[in-house]
Amino acid sequence: MKKHLNTNVGEGSKKRMEVCSEPEPDTPIKNVDIPFFEQWSEFGAFPVIYENEYCLIREVSYPLDYQHGKYTFDMLPQIVKIWNESDLKHPLSAKGFETNQMFFFDTETTGLGGGAGTSIFLLGYAFLEDEHIKVRQHFLPRPGFEIPFYKTFLEKVNYETLVTYNGKAFDWPQVVTQHTLLRQHLPKLPNFGHFDLYHASRRLWKNKLDRVKLSVVEKEVLGFERKDDVPGYLAPIIYFDYIDRKNPEAIFKIMKHNEWDVLSLITLYI
């Protein structure tokens, strides 16, 4: 545990899903005011404090036999093994990589089109560790706290392959831009390979589906239908409302939306 990490996690859990906890903090949490701290803890998020700034991190763990739509996560190691045993040349081939190097990544931002003025407020990713699929999310509680937000993210990124849904054009360039602005404060940006499942989905299903948005592909192809989901286009409005009122209730729904996104990237890759 790095020196600047403060950690307090609630006891919440679900039958087939475990909210992961971290060790006790090294620095007193009382040094930083965290609005609605109890609600964050109950949701399974803990603060990470760095020089009087902080971000919030949530981690959830799923067993490999967990079924997400039509598929279970234990199929991922099988697929990676097949790629490694195959000589087939394909843009999505995982040949040369291990399953625990796959990094299924998505963000939520303050704007849907990218460009100037758009900032990431949630970094979410799923990965294989200790025979579980883990989802880790880093949340930016306010503009100006980007250093702990990106620092903790980059400190935990040890994966060589980035898997996204249109992330090559949108999500990762946003990270690169922010890193450029803060690079003297942040770890070196890792080198990633990049598997973008959006382009493969367009080639496969653009003539069969009305749209190839991830939520549509989930429902029509992967057999996963979201319940009580918050549409992604509402994320900027919800985040700005959170900045104003600090109540995280609606943010929790955005984080669940993001969690489903990264889990669906796994089953889509399968």
Question: Whereabouts are the PLM-identified features?
Answer:
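Active-site-proximal flexible loops/turns
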Residues: 113-115, 173, 203, 268
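N-terminal accessory regions of nucleic-acid-interacting proteins
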Residues: 1-98
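Conserved RNase H-like, two-metal-ion catalytic cores of nucleic-acid enzymes
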Residues: 89-161
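Acidic active-site catalytic centers that drive phospho-/nucleotidyl reactions
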Residues: 106-108, 171, 196, 261
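Acidic, Mg2+-coordinating catalytic module of metal-dependent nucleases/exonucleases
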Residues: 209, 214-270
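Short, conserved acidic/polar surface loops in the N-terminal third of protein domains
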Residues: 68-69, 113-118, 175
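Short hydrophobic "helix-edge" motifs at membrane interfaces and signal-peptide entry regions
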Residues: 96-97, 186, 250-251
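Conserved DEDDh/DEDDy metal-dependent 3′-5′ exonuclease domain
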Residues: 130-221
